[in-house]
Amino acid sequence: MAQADTAAVQQLLECDPVWAAYALADLQPAFAPVCAWTVGTDNVDRAVALVFTGLEMPTLFLSGPANAAADAVAQIPALPEQVYITVREEHVPVVDRHWDFSRDTRPMWRLALAADTALPHRETPGLMRLTAGDSDRLRALYRHGGPFTPDAFSPYQVDNGVFWGIADDDGALLAAGGTHIVNWELGVGAIGNMYTRPDSRGRGYAGVVLAAIVNTLRAGGVDNIVLNVDQRNEAARSIYEKDGFRIHCPYVEGIGVKRET
């Protein structure tokens, strides 16, 4: 789809801005080289497909009625051999026609924070705003691993977004989190990369970091704040709901391998 068509894409995405938050953020001109948009129709409704190639594996996002989404996928010039999906449950049959997801699918929740909600500031020793220069410290933190460890961190996310962390006396991060992507112009931000070191859990660090991220986004004019939670991660969901996030919809993430034709 030509760049001139992004205005039409934006109009369609804004029919459900919470679900489409990542895609709305991807409309920034800086991401144009790694975004391929198609619009499909079932002769009644329209849907959007986005193939994003800015990460190690291409990602596919769909928004709109399933039949129209199927038409949008059919218009993608070259389907990736491997793809990471972010799709609503009704879109799963659409993508399953083209890729095999038998090895990796994860049921997820999309949560959103009401536009008029801010979180109380929680001062904690070692709390600091992180910059791109802290990328190595973030990677070191995430290397502690375990279930639900962030697996899509990239330093560019720090450059464009908001990251906060809590460090010990030696400067090592005990907990951190930030944004996957922010579109300051459209007021959209997606929170992610949240992680607390296993030996530092149970101290409320996740809530402190979350509040710092949310309030920084709010100060920058971001009204549409979303985040994703694996449906198996009840502890994380509990933290987010305690701070006012509410479930918007279930959806599915997963890795698919292109089916042979």
Label each region the model flagged.
Residues 17-36, 143-169:
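Active-site rim helix/loop that mediates acceptor-substrate recognition in acyltransferases
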Residues 53, 152-163, 167-195:
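A conserved beta-strand-loop-helix scaffold within acyl/acetyltransferase catalytic domains
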Residues 11, 17-76, 177-188, 192:
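Conserved donor-binding loop and adjoining core beta-sheet/short helix segment
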Residues 86-92, 227-237, 254-260:
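Conserved beta-strand-loop-alpha-helix junction that forms the acyl-donor binding cleft
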Residues 95-96, 240, 245:
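Conserved active-site tyrosine of GNAT-family acetyltransferases
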Residues 66-77, 196, 202-219, 224, ...:
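Conserved acetyl-CoA-binding loop-helix of GNAT-fold acetyltransferases
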Residues 52-123, 254:
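Acyl-donor-binding surface of acyltransferase catalytic domains
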Residues 1-21, 107-110, 114-149:
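Short amphipathic alpha-helix that is part of the acyltransferase structural core
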